[in-house]
UniProtKB/Swiss-Prot annotation:
Subunit-level organization: Oligomer. Interacts with RTN1 and TTS1.
Protein family membership: Belongs to the DP1 family.
Positions in the Cytoplasmic compartment: 1-34, 76-85, 125-182
Cellular component, GO, one term: nuclear envelope
Gene name as annotated: yop1
Lineage: Eukaryota, Fungi, Dikarya, Ascomycota, Taphrinomycotina
Segment forming the signal sequence: none
Residues that span the membrane, as ranges: 35-54, 57-75, 86-102, 106-124
Free-text comment about domains: The short lumenal loops between transmembrane domains 1 and 2 and between transmembrane domains 3 and 4 may impart a wedge-like configuration, thus deforming membranes.
One record GO biological process: cell division
Full protein name: Protein yop1
Domain of life: Eukaryota
Lumenal side: 55-56, 103-105
Length: 182
């Protein structure tokens, strides 16, 4: 299948998916502009703003919240565990990105289109078609973090299994641990 045919097929598929939004259908009916063109224009303006870094931080955080919030609410309402795992993993990865963004000024110095790249990455993470969050979890987070989580959980369970010290035993051990004055 040629590239041109695939693009037309994907655009038709997107147009069919956009038909589920009554606001876009109403806009198309009232103004005679295809909902697909309205969507693509809005996406293009959004990408331009990110490329020029006009409100990049806010725009990517809105993207990181809005679409996943919708899918997360749907996941909460279903009994399917797979979609819950997808969104928990997504939030784990985006939280890690937020930690990295502490150094955002330094990142923007070396990667001026960081916000645009982050938006593309967030879309890849969030869309079930790509399953990006699960890929990141399986290949980056799980192999390096899970052994530490298991060790921490064992330590916490040992602490919870041990009897809690009373105030008098704490005072006694503290008093005996104090070295004599010189």
């Amino acid at each position: 299948m040629s590239f041109q045919v695939r693009v037309k097929q994907n655009m038709q598929d997107l147009d069919n998916r956009l038909a589920a939004f009554p606001q876009l259908n109403s806009l198309e009916k009232n103004f005679g502009v295809s909902k697909l063109y309205v969507f693509l224009t809005a996406a293009g303006i959004y990408a331009l703003f990110l490329f020029l870094n006009w409100g990049g931080f806010l725009l990517t955080n809105l993207l990181a919240f809005a679409m996943p919030a919708f899918f997360s609410i749907n996941a909460i309402e279903t009994t399917n565990k797979a979609d819950d795992t997808q969104w928990l993993t997504y939030y784990l990865v985006t939280s890690f990105l937020n930690v990295i963004e502490y150094w955002s000024q330094l990142i923007l110095y070396y990667v001026p289109v960081y916000w645009l790249l982050k938006a593309i990455f967030l879309i890849w993470l969030a869309l079930p078609k790509f399953n990006g969050a699960t890929i990141i979890y399986r290949h980056l987070i799980r192999p390096y973090i899970t052994p530490h989580v298991i060790r921490i959980c064992k330590s916490v369970s040992r602490q919870n299994a041990a009897p809690a010290p009373t105030a008098s035993s704490f005072a006694h051990t503290t008093a005996t641990d104090i070295p004599p004055s010189i």
